[in-house]
Amino acid sequence: MDLHETARYLLQYRTERHRICAITTYKGRITAVGLNSYVKTHPEQKRLAVRVGHAEREFLHAEISALLKAKKADAIHVFRLGKDGTWRNAKPCAICELAIKERY
């Protein structure tokens, strides 16, 4: 199963407004998967949100969820699935960019 197939499988039944999946890899193998959550948060999410001036964005982002789970990672891939089942543009927000820069 490639990364797109994995992301589609994980996102297909989600009902949130933004269906976003982040997958970390190390030497081409998946090391962690993160999905965005509007009901959960994490202290690291809050810390990063405050640092970039968006304290209100404390819900757990997919990228941060994946980075917290990954023991090793040399790449992170972000996917967004539209309500119609097509892939949409996805890129990390300022909060997640900071998390990625701190990690790498």
Range-by-range predicted roles:
Residues 1-104:
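Zinc-dependent deaminase catalytic domain
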